[in-house]
Amino acid sequence: MSETLAERAAAFIVNAKNRNHSPAVVELAKRCLVDWMGVAIGASGEPVSRTVALSALAWGAQGEARILLGDRTTPALAALANATMGHALDFDDTRGHAPSHLSSPTWSAALAVAQHRDMDGVTALSAFITGYEISAVIGDVLAGGEDIGTYGFGNLMQGAGFHPTSVLGRLSATAAAAVLMGCSQEQAVNALATAATMGGGLTASFGTMAKPLHSGKAAMDGVQAAELAARGFIAAPEVFEAPGGFASAFVQTATTKFDDVTFSPGESLSDNSFKPYACGKLIHGHIDAARDLRDEWAERPVKQIRCRVAEISTRLVGRPLPTTHLEG
């Protein structure tokens, strides 16, 4: 029987400690850290950030992982609060193919576990690179069918109503945590399979506090999945490919094949990008166009501006009269 996707990803996880990443990859990972931490600190005073942080601290759980600008708690709860902050302004970095924001849940999980275990930044950096690569590659896997054509798995997932940051972010957070916890290959398989069955996050929640919570829960569940597996928890190793599993549940109108998936350290980071505007990237081009026209039309009356957009844009960011920045 051929290896499952979870088994191949687990092998990539356990070999993380033996890798020497290129300076270019390390620099990209550092930029992701700076971007995530910057937007998270910028969002620390937002109502959603305060609510989630206070809720996490109300558990009274003891640990050495710090909520940004706040107190210490367990790794899972710190990851929950910090990844929620990181996505609260919709300003965190994003992938070009699978529409996901992986740095927030992945760095939140990696930093929380590393702090709790008193591990150095280089080790946390390697864990982040490993986790990011796994989720990015899975999100980019081509899926399709006769009626719909071929698209990336992450794009089809979003079209079906699932938030890729939530679903894929759980896997990257799990992988990063598993690296730092020193999970065996069998434990890493079970950690990823556990994270896969926890997946969720609905795009109908966009425009509310629930959207940044998707990122927070992805980070929290990733840490918890790795912790459970490290203590002997067993899940389904074939969960990604099996009927009723990850692929068939999140993209029901297409066939997804993970047979040829391979992971290359840091390769997917080159497709990461940093947002110029704090809103969904689907409308960044329209903002650019408006800015280009601003000077030319500054002194002329404008009654109406019409923009052509994809159908999914109207569903995800189509709020003509937003009342909060969460609706961007």
Annotated model-derived regions:
Residues S103-P105, V167, C279-L282, G328:
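Conserved phosphate/anionic-ligand binding catalytic regions in large, soluble enzymes, centered on
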Residues G280-G328:
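Intrinsically disordered, low-complexity Ser/Thr/Pro/Gly-rich interaction regions
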Residues M1-S270, S313:
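N-terminal core-entry segment
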Residues L269-L282:
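Glycine-rich phosphate/diphosphate-binding loops and the adjacent beta-loop-alpha structural elements
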